[in-house]
């Protein structure tokens, strides 16, 4: 893990702690710069990767979800959205921030948070397909909206997949997501 400090004239400096680099893999660290109002650093801390960090276990869900007759929304077909809303915490955490994230960028982020870029190409492809399928299930069933929430998915491993704000993105994972963009398991 590395710390990245970014300074540019006319912008507030930013420090990103926890940026990951893997041997033999190219990565891109996104940094959001704000127009300068003061000189203080904006600190961003990227938590541990899910393969070695401590995160809550997935809460089991029934594979077949019962539908209610009370007007529950389920889309008529699978739609690959342009954006999704990621709730950065547990569904009931009203203090957690919501992020509007391009669907493609969300998939790249989750893949980089949950698998290693050094894995064999076929393993990366299989995991990305599973990540996209799980995400599209949440979109298609309007899972959280039907529970009264205003977001698409959470960043909590207890409920969904790990999404990390400003996560380091690996070039090979990014390329594979772009290649598999419209695929999913049904």
Summary of predicted features, one role per range:
Residues 1-186:
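Conserved, single-site charged/polar hotspot
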């Amino acid at each position: 893990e590395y710390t990245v400090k970014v300074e540019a004239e006319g912008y507030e400096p930013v420090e990103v702690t926890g940026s990951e680099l893997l041997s033999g893999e190219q990565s891109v660290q996104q940094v959001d710069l704000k127009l300068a109002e003061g000189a203080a650093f904006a600190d961003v801390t990227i938590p541990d990767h899910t393969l070695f960090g401590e995160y809550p276990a997935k809460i089991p869900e029934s594979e077949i979800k019962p539908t209610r007759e009370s007007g529950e929304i389920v889309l008529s077909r699978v739609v690959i959205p342009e954006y999704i809303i990621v709730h950065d915490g547990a569904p009931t955490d009203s203090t957690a921030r919501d992020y509007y994230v391009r669907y493609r960028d969300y998939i790249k982020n989750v893949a980089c948070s949950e698998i290693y870029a050094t894995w064999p190409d076929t393993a990366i492809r299989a995991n990305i397909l599973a990540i996209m399928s799980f995400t599209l299930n949440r979109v298609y069933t309007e899972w959280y909206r039907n529970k009264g929430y205003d977001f698409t998915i959470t960043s909590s491993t207890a409920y969904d997949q790990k999404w990390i704000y400003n996560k380091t993105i690996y070039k090979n994972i990014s390329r594979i997501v772009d290649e598999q963009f419209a695929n999913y398991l049904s």
